[in-house]
């Protein structure tokens, strides 16, 4: 089964995320487990955790189909030792929050070298950060998201993802989330079924489909290779509908969260219906 959903709000409490997902007909969802633009957040309360788990069960959401995202402030490749330590501590806390909620995945952006160190050194720092977090926690899989190639962010090339994975000590707890807008922005074509097939074949050769734990389904506002992270609604951007038809019809993407992050949250229910109509 294809598990299409969206990145839903936790306004009023994390326990509202599965309710918001159910309301739009989602079969998966993503969420922040805290304010993503602050370093410090209060611990999760037992009542919220219990309600979250109860609502997930009622909505039929298995932990494999829920893709929490870490804070945007975290940079696991930060060249500044003090800031790197702060990011590592926050990342471990994010992993712990996911575990508290009974979740098994944590989606994150790899990191940025900030023009202060080279790519290889930064990739090494990112991998070291992940290894530390895996050792400090019990079961959550760290899910690296590919990036659009903006600025000094790493992760836009499949080779970056492979280089990180190669340095991970426990590869049973590392995975990848592919964002379609980011793929397109970094030069991986999805505009036709044939182009999409070539892109995912390249991903399989370079990284391995066994590492794919989720996807973000977003059309792209800017042309192929723009290196700009600008999302568009499904079928209304430069990717177009055929790449998404390929994803919805391919057996490669069964039983992983396929998460909308498109600009119009009011239209997510209709976009989910549109995607299922492509099967």
Swiss-Prot record:
EC number: 3.1.21.2
Binding site for Zn(2+) 1: 69, 109, 145
Record's keyword terms, sorted: DNA damage, DNA repair, Endonuclease, Hydrolase, Metal-binding, Nuclease, Zinc
Reactions this protein catalyses: Endonucleolytic cleavage to 5'-phosphooligonucleotide end-products
Residues annotated for Zn(2+) 2 binding in this entry: 145, 179, 216, 261
Cofactor note: Binds 3 Zn(2+) ions.
CDD domains hit by this protein: AP2Ec
PANTHER family: APURINIC-APYRIMIDINIC ENDONUCLEASE, ENDONUCLEASE IV ENDODEOXYRIBONUCLEASE IV
Function summary: Endonuclease IV plays a role in DNA repair. It cleaves phosphodiester bonds at apurinic or apyrimidinic (AP) sites, generating a 3'-hydroxyl group and a 5'-terminal sugar phosphate.
Protein name: Probable endonuclease 4
Source organism per UniProt: Chlorobium phaeovibrioides (strain DSM 265 / 1930)
